[in-house]
Amino acid sequence: MSNKGQLLQDPFLNALRKEHVPVSIYLVNGIKLQGNIESFDQYVVLLRNTVTQMVYKHAISTVVPARAVNFRVDEASDA
């Protein structure tokens, strides 16, 4: 994954994790998962509901927070 992609993903996912915002994650096959982001890295997201699921990022289509989230992206980027 490009560094520019990480510049957007990391602050967004980290804000969702820190603020314990419930999310709906839609997979590329149409399945909807719901829960809270427990952790993430370059390749996976740990999603917690009644159990913790490891979801591979390449399978994720969309992440939809239950409420608006403010997150900061580096001002130095050209995004």
From Swiss-Prot:
Signal peptide stretch: none
Domain Sm per the UniProt entry, residue ranges: 10-69
Record flagged with keyword Magnesium: no
Matches recorded under Gene3D superfamilies: 2.30.30.100
One GO cellular component, as annotated: cytosol
Keywords: RNA-binding, Stress response
GO BP terms, alphabetized: regulation of DNA-templated transcription; regulation of RNA stability; regulation of translation, ncRNA-mediated
Highest taxon listed in the record's lineage: Bacteria
Keyword hit for Metal-binding: no
A GO term for molecular function: RNA binding
PANTHER family: RNA-BINDING PROTEIN HFQ
Subunit structure: Homohexamer.
Function in brief: RNA chaperone that binds small regulatory RNA (sRNAs) and mRNAs to facilitate mRNA translational regulation in response to envelope stress, environmental stress and changes in metabolite concentrations. Also binds with high specificity to tRNAs.
UniProt family annotation: Belongs to the Hfq family.
Protein name, as recorded: RNA-binding protein Hfq
Gene: hfq
